[in-house]
């Protein structure tokens, strides 16, 4: 499953690997990878595979789920497809409450005591997913965990999720993606080394000259 999804993401250009010409994230950090899972929306076969995979993860790890919650905005569409497949209620959670109208942060019904699974497109440092989890908990929901399409497998993300006491499972990850990219001849040994060094310590730009 992990390599299959990784292959899909590479084929449609949802993930770019540029170890020799790094991207600059909004945080200012240099990165050899850029992930835009919104592109999956434009590829029916890919998004169907993702929805089926997320459903499988949820059934395996969170079988008692009652509500599917998407993170705004990237997780909304995937949450909708998954909830439809599972015939479950769905809501989505904003990064913060609206400044007008009812001032909702949670759109749709997620009632006190209900068991909820969060659907996220990407786990990097885990910030947006944790914001979603906290909002649902404040509303009295029991958050069973998070499922996502892809994770960078960053230690910072793992630590934040552990600190928030929330389980998280991804369809694919950085390790599987770099392995598939190497198998496809998209990266060579030198590039693979840089990619591996970056994941060990993203904040240390020494990987650029590795």
Curated annotation (Swiss-Prot):
Pfam families: Pribosyltran. Belongs to the purine/pyrimidine phosphoribosyltransferase family. PyrE subfamily. InterPro entries: OPRT, Or_phspho_trans_dom, PRibTrfase_dom, PRTase-like. Keywords: Glycosyltransferase, Magnesium, Pyrimidine biosynthesis, Transferase. It catalyses: orotidine 5'-phosphate + diphosphate = orotate + 5-phospho-alpha-D-ribose 1-diphosphate. Orotate binds at residue 124. It comes from the Bacteria. Its EC number is 2.4.2.10. The gene is pyrE. This is Orotate phosphoribosyltransferase. Catalyzes the transfer of a ribosyl phosphate group from 5-phosphoribose 1-diphosphate to orotate, leading to the formation of orotidine monophosphate (OMP). It is an enzyme of class 2 (transferase). Pathway: Pyrimidine metabolism; UMP biosynthesis via de novo pathway; UMP from orotate: step 1/2. Its cofactor is Mg(2+).
